[in-house]
Amino acid sequence: MSRRKAGSAPRRVEPAPAANPDDEMEMQDLVIELKPEPDAQPQQAPRLGPFSPKEVSSAGRFGGEPHHSPGPMPAGAALLALGPRNPWTLWTPLTPNYPDRQPWTDKHPDLLTCGRCLQTFPLEAITAFMDHKKLGCQLFRGPSRGQGSEREELKALSCLRCGKQFTVAWKLLRHAQWDHGLSIYQTESEAPEAPLLGLAEVAAAVSAVVGPAAEAKSPRASGSGLTRRSPTCPVCKKTLSSFSNLKVHMRSHTGERPYACDQCPYACAQSSKLNRHKKTHRQVPPQSPLMADTSQEQASAAPPEPAVHAAAPTSTLPCSGGEGAGAAATAGVQEPGAPGSGAQAGPGGDTWGAITTEQRTDPANSQKASPKKMPKSGGKSRGPGGSCEFCGKHFTNSSNLTVHRRSHTGERPYTCEFCNYACAQSSKLNRHRRMHGMTPGSTRFECPHCHVPFGLRATLDKHLRQKHPEAAGEA
C-alpha cells in the first residue's frame, strides 16, 4: 500500500495502450458478439424433436409477426447463435391452441352450419346463430351492437341436463359431447332426418317416391351386390319388405282406391281384390224345366235327410243388392243337421221364403217341409263349393259357404225355445240346449219366476242373480 502526504491531490493513472490496436476488446462488459460470414452457410442444428427450426416459430409469437433479435449474448452463456433465430426455440415446440378449435384437428376452426340455408357461423357467434334460426334463416351480417350487448348479458350458459354452468359456449358443447355422450358433429355419411309429412303431402308424393323408377334404381336390380334397406312408412314408421308393398300400404293412410269395379261402385286398393270381386258378378245360368222336374221327383222319392242341397251353389247376386241380397242368398241353402232351413225362391226370383219358429223347433215339420222346398242336386249330400260374394273367400262345399255368409249378413236362423238365444249353426244350438237340461236322463232345475229349465243348480243360481236379483236377495 502506497502512502501519500496529506493535502496532496490524487494522481490519475492512464491505462496503458494496447499492443495491437486491431485486436482491442471491450473489457468493461465482457460481451462476445459473433457475426456469421456473408458467404458462409449457417450451420444447421440437428432436429431435437418433431419440429424443425423452420416449422416452429419463436416463443410468444406466431407467423407473420416481426422478429426481434435478442441482441448480444452474454459470454457466460457459452452458446453459439445459429443464424438470426433464437436457439432456445428449438426446445420449445409450441402449437397454436385457439379456444374454438376442434379437439382432433388444428387446421380448421369450428363452424355452426344451418341445415336449411347451409350458412356457416363461427362458434364464437353462437348467439347470432340462434337469432338466425329464430328469425327464419336471415343472412348473418356480423355481430351488431344489439348482438354484442346480448353476448355481454349472457354471462353463463347452463346445461339443461345436469344444470352445470359455463362461461364459454365451446366448453358447454364439449361438456355435452364428453359427459353426456351427445353427438355435436355431423360426418359426411350422416344426413339430417326428413321431417314427417302430412297425409296430403304423402298422397301427392307417393307416386314419385316409390314409383317404378325407384324399383329400377334399387341396388338389387342393378346387380351391385349392396344390401338394400327395407322401406319404411313415413306416417306410421312400419317397415315393409319392398317398395311395391309400401306403395300399397300408403293407400291405407291416404284413402286412395285406384281399382274400381265397372259394374258397381266397389273400389279397392289392390288389383287382386278387384279380380276377386269381379267373380261375384257372374250370373246364374237359368235352369231348364226338365232338370227342375227331375230334381223334384228325386227329392220326393228320397227319404228326408238333414244334408245340404244348394239350389245354385256357385250362384251369387249383384253387389247392388246389399245386405238384403246376401241374406237372400243364405236363406236358400241348408246346413247339415239343421232342423229345417230351406226356402226356395218364388217365380220372380226376388222374394225368398221365411222360416218360422215352428219349423225351426219342430223336427217333424222341418223334415216334411225340406223335401218339398229344397230340390236335390243329383242325389249328393253336399254340393260343390263357391266363393263368398262379400269377401271373395273360397270354400270347398256349400255348407261352409252358407255358414260363412251368415257372418256377413248377421242371420241367426237357429233360436232356443226356452230363451232368446239365437245362433247361425245348429251345433251351437244343440250345445246351448244342454244348458237347459234337454239331454235324455238329465235332471232339470226350473226357475220359479220365468219357468226356464236348467241342467245344473249353479246355472240356475247364476240366472237368478242376473235376471231376478230381487228374488235372489230375498232367498
From Swiss-Prot:
Gene Ontology biological-process annotations: negative regulation of dendrite development; negative regulation of transcription by RNA polymerase II; regulation of transcription by RNA polymerase II; spermatogenesis
Region (Disordered) location: 1-78, 275-385
Gene Ontology molecular function terms on file: DNA-binding transcription factor activity; RNA polymerase II cis-regulatory region sequence-specific DNA binding; sequence-specific double-stranded DNA binding; zinc ion binding
Family annotation (SMART domains): ZnF_C2H2 (SM00355)
Compositionally biased intervals (Gly residues): 339-351
Key words of the record: Isopeptide bond, Metal-binding, Nucleus, Repeat, Transcription, Transcription regulation, Ubl conjugation, Zinc, Zinc-finger
GO cellular component, one term: nucleus
Subcellular location: Nucleus
Residue stretches of biased makeup (Low complexity): 295-313, 326-338
Zinc finger (C2H2-type): 157-180, 231-253, 259-281, 386-408, 414-436, 445-468
Keyword flag Electron transport: no
Pfam short name (any one): zf-C2H2
Positions with biased composition (Polar residues): 354-367
Gene3D superfamilies registered for this protein in UniProt: Classic Zinc Finger (3.30.160.60)
Crosslink (Glycyl lysine isopeptide (Lys-Gly) (interchain with G-Cter in SUMO2)) position: 35
Subunit structure: Interacts with KLF4.
Family: Belongs to the krueppel C2H2-type zinc-finger protein family.
Role played: May be a transcriptional corepressor with KLF4.
Protein name, entry field: Zinc finger protein 296
Organism (species): Homo sapiens (Human)
Source species taxonomy: Eukaryota, Metazoa, Chordata, Craniata, Vertebrata
Gene: ZNF296
